[in-house]
Every structure is written in C-alpha cells, then in structure tokens.
C-alpha cells in the first residue's frame, strides 16, 4: 500500500525571478506545480504550470475567477482571439491586477490564428488556451480549424486536468480562445 501526500513550501518571488533569469526555472518548478497568488483586488487564485517553452514554463489559472466574463459583448467570434473583448480585458485590466513581481516575469506570447483564410496575429502576456492546446489535434480540424498548428499542453493530456471550478459553484465550464468552426457566434469552451 502507498500513501501520497502533497508538500507545500514557501517561496519568494525573487527566487522564482532569479531561476527564470538564470534559465533554471524548470529545475525549480515542473508541470503540475501550483502557485497561490493574490490579485490587487484581494481575490485569491492558483496558477498552475501546464506546459513548457523555450522561455520556461507556461502558467494558467487552475480554476475560474469569481466573476464570469464573456468572450465578446455580442455573440460573435469574428476576428478570432485577436479582436476579442476577452483578450482586451485580460491584457488591459487583469494584467494590472496581478502582483507586480509576477507581471514583470511574464514573457509575451505570439498567437497566430487563421480565420476564414485571414492570418490574425497578436502578442499577449495573458491568454486563454486554444482547443488544440487543451484537447490535442484530434477533432481540431472540425471544432477549431483556426488553431490546428499548435500542440497539446502537457498537463491537459488527461481529462481530469481540464476540469475547473468556479468559487461557490463547483465544477464550471470555461472559455478557450479558438473560434468554433461550426458557428460564427461562438468560441470553443470546456464543459464541466
């Protein structure tokens, strides 16, 4: 018989920042590791390492924020992620709610989508995962043809890791940045 326990330890932002600057962040943190953060509004969140890049680790929220936010004010996916209200909200409002030390360490990411034959590009510090990053390439051509050139993030290879909760509501659905291939009014999402 085995017993499995979670180990929690204190870490300072400057320790993480130094590891990132030295190119040793992946020696300190691995995919699946979680960091508890407090927004400047007081909301407490957990970010989780979900994948790796040449710059280090990719962190996304483990669960949903307390308040919901739509992809756009109207029911449309025109312009894809680049033109979405969600993108503007994350990179114009939420980015400034993050702890200063965390915000300074975020490396912007270039996001490219092909929507109706048009190449749409943006560079973002905060972003939602695509259908392909969440579920892999299987089904992406039908569900989310804008993002088929991407690969699945390591953490999301199991269904359990894709489930999120919303404070006070239990398991909850959440948005992906991929325009839904079958509907001009929707973006893809993960159901609970």
Where do the language-model regions lie?
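Collagenous Gly-X-Y triple-helix signature in extracellular proteins
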Residues: 1-192
């Amino acid at each position: 018989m085995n017993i499995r326990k979670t180990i929690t330890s204190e870490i300072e932002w400057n320790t993480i920042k130094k590891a990132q600057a030295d190119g040793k962040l992946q020696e300190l943190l691995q995919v699946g590791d979680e960091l508890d953060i407090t927004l400047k509004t007081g909301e407490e969140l957990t970010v989780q390492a979900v994948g790796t890049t040449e710059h280090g680790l990719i962190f996304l929220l483990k669960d949903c924020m307390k308040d919901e936010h739509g992809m756009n004010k109207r029911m449309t996916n025109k312009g894809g992620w680049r033109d979405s209200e969600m993108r503007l909200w994350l990179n114009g409002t939420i980015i400034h709610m993050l702890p200063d030390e965390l915000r300074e360490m975020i490396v912007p990411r270039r996001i490219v989508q092909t929507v109706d034959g048009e190449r749409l590009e943006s560079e973002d510090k905060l972003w939602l995962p695509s259908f392909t990053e969440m579920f892999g390439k299987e089904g992406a051509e039908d569900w989310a043809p804008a993002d088929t050139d991407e690969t699945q993030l390591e953490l999301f290879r199991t269904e359990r890791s894709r489930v999120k909760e919303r404070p006070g509501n239990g398991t909850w659905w959440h948005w992906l940045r991929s325009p839904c291939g079958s509907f001009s009014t929707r973006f893809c999402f993960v159901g609970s």
